[in-house]
Structure formats: C-alpha cells, structure tokens
C-alpha cells in the first residue's frame, strides 16, 4: 500500500512554524509568570500572617492577658478584632505557654492549638493547616517576657489567612495573563500570515521545490547555450556567467562579484543599466574582440534591478551568414546548370520530333565539343573537387547569362590544403566570377577569364573581365562592406572576399587592364598563417 504524502505550501509551513514558536514561547512565559505570581502571593500571605502575629505579640494587653489569668481579657479581645478587620485575617488566636487558647477572634470552638518547636525557642513559624474545615495559612509568633538577664516565652499568637482568598487573587491574575497571551498569539498569527504572504510574493508564488527545479533547469540551459550569458544586480555587479561567456572573454572560469565594466570593458553596460534602455544587436569591441550583444533590463515596480547580456563573437556569426549566402549561390548555380541542360534537351527533342535528325546530331556534337573542351581542361588540370564543383556551376550560369567563361589552359591545381575550406572557396571564387558576370552584363563582348595555379608558395586565383573596369578613385572603396552601384542590399560580395582572404592569411590585388576590364588577383599561402602580415588589398595600377 502506497502511503499518501502530504505536501504543504511554503505559506502554510511558515505560518505553522511561527504559530508553533509563538505558542511555545508565550506558553512558557505565561506559565513562568503564573508560577512566579503564585509564589509571590503565597510569600506575601505568609509574611503578612507572621508580621501580624508578631505585632500582636508585642502589645501590652496581650502580654498581661497571658501573665494574669483574669487580666485584660476584654481589652485583648478588642485589639484582636481590630487587627483581624484591618488585615483581613480569618482568625487570630492568643495562646499560653501550654498551647491553651486564652483569646480568639470571633466565636471559635477551639480550646487548644499545637505549637511548633520554633515557638518554644522564640522563633516564628508558618504552616498550612485547616481551621473550621477550611484551608488556611497560619503564622505564629512567640509572646516574650523580658526578665532580668534573659527572655522567657510565655505564650504565642497565631494568625490564620484563608488560602481561598490567595487563590482567588492568583486566578484573577492568571485570567488577565491569559487574555494578554491570547491577544499576543492573535497578533502573532496575523503577523505570520502577513510575513508568509510577503515571502510568497517575493518568490513569485513559487514553492521551494519549484524554485529548485527552475534553478536546475536554468543551469542546464545556461550550460547548453553556446551564446555568452551574463547577469548583474542593480549595482552592476556580475551575479551569473555561463561557461560560454567565460570562454569567449578568455577567462579561466566563470567569475562573479566583479563589476560588469571590469568583465566587459568598453561595452558601456553600466550606462545601459542606469538608463534602463535595451540594446538589440549592438556591435561592441571588448579586449580587441568584436561581439554582437543584446541586453535586457530587468525591471520590477518600474525600477531596474539588473541586466542580462547575451553575446556572440561577430566573426562566428559572420562565418555562418557568409556560408549560408554562398551555399545559396552555389545552389543557384546548380539550378542554372540544370535549367541550361533542360533547355538543350528540349531543343534536341524538338528537332527529333520535326525529323531534323542532322541538326539534332550537329547540336549534340557542338555541345559535346564545348563541354569536352571545358571538362578536359577542368578535370585534367584542376584536381580539387571543391574548385571543380564551383566552376561547373559557374560554367552553366555563364551559359544561361550568355557570358563566355574561359578557364585559362595554363591553370593547374593540386588538392588543396586542409585549412582552405569549401566555404572559403565558394566565397572567393564564386563572388569574383559573379562580380565579373555583372561587370560584362551590359558589354557587347561578354567574356570572363579564370586562372588558378598553385606553383610556388601561394595559390594564385585570377579573374579578369571585359567590363568597363574600376575607376582609380574607387579601387579602395569597392572592398568596403555595403559599397555598390547596383542598388540596395548589394556590395557585400567583394567585402566577403576580402574577409575570407584575410582569414587565410592572404591578400588581394585589383588592377585595370590596358584593353579595358578589371583584374582581381588573390594570393593564398599554402601553409596556414598565424597572422596576416599583408594589406587587405593592393592596387597594382593599370
């Protein structure tokens, strides 16, 4: 049988704990005060009984009553009654040395009382006993006669106080104390409820196990996210950093309790926190690194209590974007190749249906000769499959655009080194050839020449065209991102070429031919370079 487990909310637990503590503390305090008051009342009653007995024992009429059997009985009785009325005593007795009652208040039927040994030796005594069937506190004091050189105990005085009167006083005090305790408990319960509600509000209504689950999920997500994540408090001190952020910032491990401006100097994140403004996709430089950052200001009650910063390296994002762009271009080139062959197949099919067999054969031979010439040169001289695939796509695209793409017969290329990836080749070769296609689009002679060789220490790629060339004053500008004379959203191809060449440790030269047209020459070292000692591009002149 499965035992049913009871789950109590945080609010219930807090109220229960505080209530239990209040009950315990107030209960202990009430009992302590009650015991102290009870003991105090009893001591007060005992002291009053003894003090009254002593006072009466010193009175001359009382002493004379004991010394003389017939003396001052009426006067002594009057004194006793007065003392009884003044002190509120239940009964007062005057005894001789044998314990016989010589005088008593009221109409007591007692004839004799037992005396303690303390009385016989001149001491006072307090006891609890019964008188007329009622519980009393009895205080006794000796009656002492001074003789020459000594004192003699000739009798004693006993004063009784009812215990019920003391108990009533104690009960009254306990009732008052109980009322106060109940009021304090009630206020404590109300305070506990308010505190529990406030704590629940601070925890956004979440229970401890839910907070723990969210904490574990947060840590798992922060570990899985490849973006750098940093959070701060309202003072701009780092309270959280994931592993990716530490790696990007070249820190040995995630750090906290440091100002955000010390962790990411130059990013201006403290001003973001002070102004309470978000920064979407901002490019910032931190320690010679360029990041794309996004900031989110955390607000509560209209006040900022911290920021969350997410960031990635710009180069990583750029590589991803450029790769996607170039893969799309590569896909378009393959589509152009498919489209071109489809057109030629339909042309051959049409000639066959019309019975023009000789013309169909001539078209096939012509296409075969063109493809054979290009393919022989491509596959015999160039042994890099990546470059072969790119050029095949561009050949088909050139045919579709009615542009003559010529691969220089002196081209030669062995398999490329491992550090030169397909994305680099697509970016460099693809953009240079596409740029040449656009340059000759409005020319009467539409020809693009491609040359590649790996002789020497560098891989040399050269693309020339029969276009109008590049004005000398714009040679520097053509490699800037966004520069284009062809409209919006253009001017990124040559900038991407420059970036890819720099990543490979190479450089690019741009010149104008004497006969017209531009020549782009790229030099890429065969061995991977640690840095780039060359300029991003060089103008060789016309």
From Swiss-Prot:
GO terms for cellular component: plasma membrane. One of its GO terms (molecular function) is ATP binding. Member of the two-component regulatory system CitT/CitS. Regulates the expression of the citM-yflN operon. Functions probably as a membrane-associated protein kinase that phosphorylates CitT in response to environmental citrate or Mg(2+)-citrate complex. Keywords: ATP-binding, Cell membrane, Kinase, Membrane, Nucleotide-binding, Phosphoprotein, Transferase, Transmembrane, Transmembrane helix, Two-component regulatory system. Its main location: membrane. SMART domains: HATPase_c. This is Sensor protein CitS. It is found in: Cell membrane. It comes from Bacillus subtilis (strain 168). The chain crosses the membrane at residues 14-34, 176-196. The modification Phosphohistidine is found at residue 339. It holds the Pfam family sCache_3_2. It catalyses: ATP + protein L-histidine = ADP + protein N-phospho-L-histidine. Residues 35-175 are extracellular. Its EC number is 2.7.13.3. PANTHER family: SENSOR PROTEIN CITS, TWO-COMPONENT HISTIDINE KINASE.
